[in-house]
Swiss-Prot record:
Keywords: Cytoplasm, NAD, Oxidoreductase. Its EC number is 1.1.1.27. InterPro entries: L-lactate/malate_DH, L-lactate_DH, L-lactate_DH_AS, Lactate/malate_DH_C, Lactate/malate_DH_N, Lactate_DH/Glyco_Ohase_4_C, NAD(P)-bd_dom_sf. Pfam families: Ldh_1_C, Ldh_1_N. This is L-lactate dehydrogenase B chain. The keyword Nucleotidyltransferase does not apply. The gene is LDHB. It comes from Sceloporus woodi. One of its GO terms (cellular component) is cytoplasm.
């Protein structure tokens, strides 16, 4: 007896069994789910996989997204505790990790996250040996280094979300001051994603007009307009949002989808993301910092040699030393 489906459909060829543009998000907390919905809204993948250790939360998030399938352009949404669900991913976004506890040092937090990553990263690589890993968990620069070490992948396929969001915050605040949309305000935050980030004032421009040429004191303590405050706001903004709502998630989710769009569509756009900078700007240790990088379908293909002032190079080197001092004491890498 033929089923309803058999009566409805005449098969012509076998449907595809392997995804061609699969994305996995590891960790379904606030950040992971913001990344997931941002990627789905942009229609960047033909399959989305979610992984976490919390099975009920995982199933609930998967079902909730699946129920929105009519409004999305993604064929398949899957989830599981077992990393087999991540097989054949093009990009794996890692948002998992432990939160900093009150009174806990940064090094202790990093060591706890290293222990989490020691479980996650080998599983990711086992099921998707050709994937690109995008690390989002904080402290992102150090955990990108940890991922690179644990994965055995070439450095162009291990990328940290880095200063992509810091630069977006900077451009938003710049736009607020000038009454111009952030996409027309150009400026770069480089170095560590965090307190020691570097604002490249010499490159800040609108329509190719250098703002530092109009205001030579821009970014310095002598600036009567206080533009230095804009960079301080960038550094402080995450702390402020966390204080107000407990975490940040929407902006980082959008930032990650922006990076994924460049990778999945091979756009060769330039983003400030965290990459291995040994040998650049006089940095001698294996640290990951944000520099302007060209991204495409094979990962991070090149770094733009930005002309930095001596003071900016010195700040980058300080960032590198700060990170190395934490990294060199990490165990079991």
């Amino acid at each position: 007896m033929a089923s309803l489906k058999d009566k409805l459909i005449t098969p012509v060829a076998q449907p595809a069994t392997q995804p061609t543009s699969k994305v996995t998000v590891v960790g379904v907390g606030q950040v992971g789910m913001a990344c997931a919905i941002s990627v789905l809204e942009k229609g960047l993948c033909d399959e989305l996989a979610l992984v976490d250790v919390l099975e009920d939360k995982l199933k609930g998030e998967m079902m909730d997204l699946q129920h929105g399938s009519l409004f999305l352009k993604t064929n398949k949404i899957v989830a599981g505790k077992d990393y087999a669900v991540t097989a054949n991913s093009k990009v794996v976004v890692v948002t998992a990790g432990v939160r900093q506890q009150e009174g806990e040092s940064r090094l202790d937090l990093v060591q706890r996250n290293v222990n989490v990553f020691k479980f996650i990263i080998p599983q990711v690589v086992k099921y998707s040996p050709d994937c690109i890993i995008l690390v989002v968990s904080n402290p992102v620069d150090i955990l990108t280094y940890v991922t690179w070490k644990l994965s055995g992948l070439p450095k162009h396929r291990v990328i940290g979300s880095g200063c992509n969001l810091d630069s977006a915050r900077f451009r938003f605040l710049m736009g607020e001051r000038l009454g111009i949309h952030p996409s027309s305000c150009h400026g770069w935050i480089l170095g560590e994603h965090g307190d020691s980030s570097v604002a490249v004032w010499s490159g800040v421009n609108v329509a190719g007009v250098s703002l530092q040429e109009l205001n030579p004191a821009m970014g310095s303590d002598q600036d009567s307009e206080g533009w230095k405050q804009v960079h301080k706001q960038v550094v402080d903004s995450a702390y402020e949002v966390i204080k107000l709502k407990g975490y940040t998630n929407w902006a980082i989710g959008l930032s990650v989808a922006d990076l994924l769009e460049t990778i999945m569509k091979n756009l060769c756009r330039v983003h400030p993301v965290s990459t291995m900078v040994k040998g650049m700007y006089g940095i001698e240790n294996e640290v990951f910092l944000s520099l302007p990088c060209v991204l495409g379908s094979v990962g991070l293909t090149s770094v733009i040699n930005q002309k930095l002032k001596d003071s900016e190079v010195a700040q980058l080197q300080t960032s590198a030393t700060t990170l190395w001092n934490v990294q060199k004491d990490l165990k079991d890498l």
